[in-house]
Structure formats: C-alpha cells, structure tokens
C-alpha cells in the first residue's frame, strides 16, 4: 500500500525532469496518488511535454498566478474532474534578473512586486484554488529555501521566501479549523533549471556538502520529494505551520 493511495493531488512547478516538482510528482504517483499538473506562460508547453514522462493522459491546467481568473479557472477545472482534492504542492517562484545577483539596493519596486506576487502571494492563490474541494481536510506543501539568513546573490528572492514562510503560517492558522494543513519544506540546493538561473548558485554547491553533517548532493532531488510526499500523506496529521528542513542539517550548524 502506497503512502498516497487514493489521494488526489495538484502539483505545480513541473517544467523539466530536473524540476524538484517533477521528483515530487513522480514519487507521489509511485505511492498511489492521482495527479493533475499546472503550468504557466511560455512554460506551459514544457510542462505538457514533461507530463507525458509521468503518464500519457495526465491533465495539465494553465495556472498563471499573475492572472486572478486563472485561480477561478483551476478551481472550476478541478471541480469538474474530482469531487474532492486531498493535497497540493506549491513549487512556484520567479524573480526578474534585477532582483537577484547582488543588486539588492538598486532593485525597483515593480520588479520586487512581480517576484513577491509569483513567489509568495501565489501560495494564497493556490489555497484559494484547492481548498473549496478539500472537503475532508487536506495538505498543502510548499518548497522553500531557508529565509533566516541573507544568502549571496539571492537578494529579493530571499525576502520573498521569508514572505512565503509567513504566508504559510497564516494559512495554517486560518485553514486548520477545516483540517487543512499547510507546511513548507526548506530544501538544500538542488541543481534544477531554476537554481541555475540564480547568480552565484555554485557557491552553495561548493560549501553545502562539507558543512552539512549528513552531507548533501545537489543532484539528489528524491530526498526532498520524500519529505513532501510524507507531508502530503496522512502521516503528519497534527503538523501545520511547520518548516521542515531537508538540507543535510546545514541550517543547524554554526560557522
């Protein structure tokens, strides 16, 4: 019996086989989940292609969090397909180039606003889309990167992750009475398409494995996927508002 047998789960953020969201989707499917994916903008066709590597008939919905109407459309499409939904993965993040790479003091508000809406507010948008169908409770899990410290080059995306963490706590508060949990997985660096677009990402690669007491491989997304699938399952019924660090222990170490 799989951890997610009989579960219906919406997965955002699948672009390529290297995506963390793909690793989660693949493992969730192997653990028995029925899936729907979402994609957005120019990446939608890429998501559709990658979805075929999971299943030939996997539905892919358009969900651009910059468009309010997409939230309503996703909710309607899910209601047409399923009478309930059990879980959702938030793997949505983006920042314009000007918001990354050591340009913190010069980034204009318009670019910050785009990063904030796509990377943080989108968790609320996802909740709006899925919670009407979480009639028997459910689990929302988001991918995070530790926002307790300032990282080289991460800049406004780090601020967005701090906002994401706070958003998750408030969703946990307001959705808890409906038995809907909201948690984040703060992953160590994994070599994905998104990660490679962050200036200085290789600095994380160089030091993480040496400092993490359990070690760390930037080429192993499955350790992150396992945590996400566990949180999507029924095995954490009393856990919400949590940030689960899956980073080899790096976050707990001093200099």
Spans of features found by a protein language model:
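Canonical Rossmann dinucleotide-binding motif of NAD(H)/NADP(H)-dependent dehydrogenases/reductases
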Residues: 2-37
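Hydrophobic structural elements of the Rossmann-like NAD(P)H-binding subdomain
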Residues: 11, 89, 141, 182-185, ...
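Catalytic loop of short-chain dehydrogenase/reductase
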Residues: 13-22, 93-132, 136-177, 189-191, ...
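Aromatic pocket-lining residues of Rossmann-like dinucleotide-binding sites
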Residues: 28, 175, 231
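Short coil/turn segments at alpha/beta junctions that flank glycine-rich nucleotide-binding fingerprints
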Residues: 31, 81, 133-137, 177-180, ...
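Conserved mid-core segment of classical short-chain dehydrogenase/reductases
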Residues: 55, 61-72, 76-81, 87-113, ...
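C-terminal helical subdomain
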Residues: 121, 184, 203-239, 244-248
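A glycine/serine/threonine-rich, flexible loop-to-helix segment
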Residues: 177, 189-213, 253-255
């Amino acid at each position: 019996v799989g951890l997610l047998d009989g579960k219906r789960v919406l997965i955002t953020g699948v672009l390529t086989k290297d995506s963390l969201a793909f690793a989660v989707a693949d493992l969730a499917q192997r653990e028995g989940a029925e899936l729907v994916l979402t994609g957005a903008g120019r990446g939608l066709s890429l998501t559709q292609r990658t979805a075929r590597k999971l299943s030939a008939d996997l539905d892919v919905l358009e969900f651009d969090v910059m468009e309010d109407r997409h939230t309503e459309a996703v909710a309607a499409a899910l209601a047409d397909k399923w009478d309930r939904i059990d879980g959702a993965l938030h793997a949505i993040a983006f920042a314009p180039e000007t918001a990354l790479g050591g340009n913190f003091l010069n980034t204009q508000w318009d670019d910050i606003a785009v990063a904030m809406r796509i990377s943080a507010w989108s968790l609320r948008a996802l909740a709006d889309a899925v919670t009407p169908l979480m009639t028997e409770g459910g689990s929302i899990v988001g991918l995070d990167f530790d926002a307790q410290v300032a990282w080289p080059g991460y800049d406004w995306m780090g601020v967005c992750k701090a906002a994401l963490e706070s958003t998750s706590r408030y969703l946990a508060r307001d959705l808890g009475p409906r038995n809907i949990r909201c948690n984040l997985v703060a992953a160590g660096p994994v070599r994905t398409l998104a990660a490679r677009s962050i200036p200085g990402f290789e600095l994380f690669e160089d030091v993480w494995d040496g400092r993490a007491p359990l070690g760390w491989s930037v080429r192993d997304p499955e350790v992150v996927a396992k945590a996400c699938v566990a949180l999507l399952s029924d095995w954490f019924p009393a856990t919400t508002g949590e940030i689960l660090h899956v980073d080899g222990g790096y976050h707990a170490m001093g200099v």
